[in-house]
Amino acid sequence: LGDVYKRQKAMFVEDGSDVQAKNGILHEIDSWLPLWESEIPVLVEWDFADYEEVAAWVNGGYGDPDQKYQTVDEGEHQSDVSSLACYTIDAKSSATSTDGSNGGYYPVGYATPKTGSAWTNCKNKDHIYLNLGYNGSIIMKTPILIAGKYKVILKVTYATSMNFMRTMTSGSNGGKIRFTFDGDSETTTEIPIYASITANTLGLYDTVIYDEIEFSKTGTHSMKMVIADPAATSNSKFRIQLDYMTFEPIIEDE
């Protein structure tokens, strides 16, 4: 094997090549083919609900029995996915009911919109609700990111009942969230994710979380979000609604 790795290329095995198969010709090689790994960051869109566990849970009927994964319906649907392994949560006391089947919002709710709603424009036709209370938190793993610098943009969903967050009234600071990557305090930033919305109109909106953040290693990363808006303990309409996060590469000229 040592000689093969030193050669750094795979060779055809003559006796095992040109073998007729049903859908083509088989050729045997004597080593692994090398894997190519980009060193240049690429655009990544991270859908917070795009997990196999969520799909299996919803389609298995463990949530709202009328809900189908990534599917628009005549009515809105919400399933409780708080216990799934893709979400690590620390829920605190909340002024908002956590009974998502009776007008409240689960600690982590998987939501699909109704036909005709602006939320049908969500990535993959779904989004998540967070009802974790003041200083409650959630940790998730990102998709693989190539080492490099990125601008990070959060796509949020907004309803008119959240106007007090948009206007930063009734004790709200705009839906402020504290973001941290990989437990590194140097990456921590607090952003009022609804304060930049200019009109009280149901829809999807972008909020810049980082103008620039650098990841030194290629791989997945842990992202923690802490609810830093005290209105979570005082307003029964408080919740956070998220669609996806975009990692936009920053390519610097050499």
What residue spans do the PLM features occupy?
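Extracytoplasmic
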Residues: 32-254
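Extracellular/periplasmic catalytic domains that process cell-envelope and extracellular macromolecules
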Residues: 20-21, 216
